[in-house]
């Protein structure tokens, strides 16, 4: 029998060494013990996989950009090599996402009781995130399917968070941040993205006095990110309008 505390300790150690694949493997084993995760364990799992998938997302973006430039050059051999490499990274990224999604469906979301609102929203947000990462690299019907799954998870989490959590709660704010990014980047719906982000920001500002001391830093940081995105997106929309002569 694997010792749970040893696995968690290993994950902490791997995080300090920035060995995120090891960290993810340890937290995957903890999750598969099929017992609820503590807040710390939940965060360890999230940080581990965020770094594992983040490295692949970053590599994929770099190679995709090189692929576009190479296509313009017309060097067939090089084009084929770059495409094959992009597909290799894509497969790795998809495998990581499927790993997380199966942990969420088979253990984490499934085992949330009615009273574990915070955990349920956290895991549904995570589900939306990992389907969003799949949507970044998918095309055609496959993309449509993962986009729909992402929207469904975000939407469910959003409804629960609005009903049961303070507008200043960092998990509710983090969900609004990522859900609005989904609308902007994946759905190409800037108006919906801005509306969601602005509502979350305004609601939190209106209830600043409910800010929990423990989560003050997290909440205010996410509020800042929401505001930064709003500034960027509204200026982008104005630029687009300007280009179309709609000033």
UniProtKB/Swiss-Prot annotation:
It comes from the Eukaryota. The record marks 57, 132 as: Interaction with phosphoserine on interacting protein. The modification N-acetylvaline is found at residue 2. Phosphorylated by various PKC isozymes. The modification Phosphotyrosine is found at residue 133. One of its GO terms (biological process) is positive regulation of cell-cell adhesion. One of its GO terms (molecular function) is phosphorylation-dependent protein binding. The keyword Acetylation applies. Residues 2-247 are annotated as: Interaction with SPATA18/MIEAP. Gene3D superfamilies: 14-3-3 domain. GO terms for cellular component: cytoplasm; cytosol; mitochondrial matrix. The modification Phosphoserine is found at residues 71, 215, 235. It is found in: Cytoplasm, Cytosol; Mitochondrion matrix. The modification N-acetylmethionine is found at residue 1. Disulfide bonds: none annotated. The modification Phosphothreonine is found at residues 145, 234. Homodimer. Part of a complex that contains DSG3, PKP1, YAP1 and YWHAG; the complex is required for localization of DSG3 and YAP1 to the cell membrane in keratinocytes. Interacts with SAMSN1. Interacts with RAF1, SSH1 and CRTC2/TORC2. Interacts with ABL1 (phosphorylated form); the interaction retains it in the cytoplasm. Interacts with GAB2. Interacts with MDM4 (phosphorylated); negatively regulates MDM4 activity toward TP53. Interacts with PKA-phosphorylated AANAT and SIRT2. Interacts with the 'Thr-369' phosphorylated form of DAPK2. Interacts with PI4KB, TBC1D22A and TBC1D22B. Belongs to the 14-3-3 family. Adapter protein implicated in the regulation of a large spectrum of both general and specialized signaling pathways. Binds to a large number of partners, usually by recognition of a phosphoserine or phosphothreonine motif. Binding generally results in the modulation of the activity of the binding partner. Promotes inactivation of WDR24 component of the GATOR2 complex by binding to phosphorylated WDR24. Participates in the positive regulation of NMDA glutamate receptor activity by promoting the L-glutamate secretion through interaction with BEST1. This is 14-3-3 protein gamma. It comes from Bos taurus (Bovine). The lineage of its organism: Eukaryota, Metazoa, Chordata, Craniata, Vertebrata. The gene is YWHAG.
């Amino acid at each position: 029998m694997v010792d749970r505390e040893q696995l968690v300790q290993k994950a902490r150690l791997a995080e300090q060494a920035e060995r995120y694949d090891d960290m993810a493997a340890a937290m995957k084993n903890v999750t598969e013990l099929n017992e609820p995760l503590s807040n710390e364990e939940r965060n360890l799992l999230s940080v581990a996989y965020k770094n594992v998938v983040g490295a692949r997302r970053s590599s994929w973006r770099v190679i995709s950009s090189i692929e576009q430039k190479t296509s313009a050059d017309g060097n067939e051999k090089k084009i084929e090599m770059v495409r094959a490499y992009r597909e290799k990274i894509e497969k790795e990224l998809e495998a990581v996402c499927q790993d997380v999604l199966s942990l969420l469906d088979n253990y984490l979301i499934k085992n949330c009781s009615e009273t574990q609102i915070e955990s349920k929203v956290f895991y549904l947000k995570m589900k939306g995130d990992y389907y969003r990462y799949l949507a970044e690299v998918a095309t055609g019907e496959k993309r449509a399917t993962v986009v729909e799954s992402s929207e469904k998870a975000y939407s469910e989490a959003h409804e629960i968070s609005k009903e049961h959590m303070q507008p200043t709660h960092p998990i509710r704010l983090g969900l609004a941040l990522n859900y609005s990014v989904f609308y902007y980047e994946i759905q190409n719906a800037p108006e919906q993205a801005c509306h969601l982000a602005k509502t979350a920001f305004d609601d939190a500002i209106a209830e600043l006095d409910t800010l929990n001391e423990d989560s003050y830093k997290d909440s205010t940081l996410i509020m800042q990110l929401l505001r930064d995105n709003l500034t960027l997106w509204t200026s982008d929309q104005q630029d687009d309008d300007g280009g179309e002569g709609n000033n």
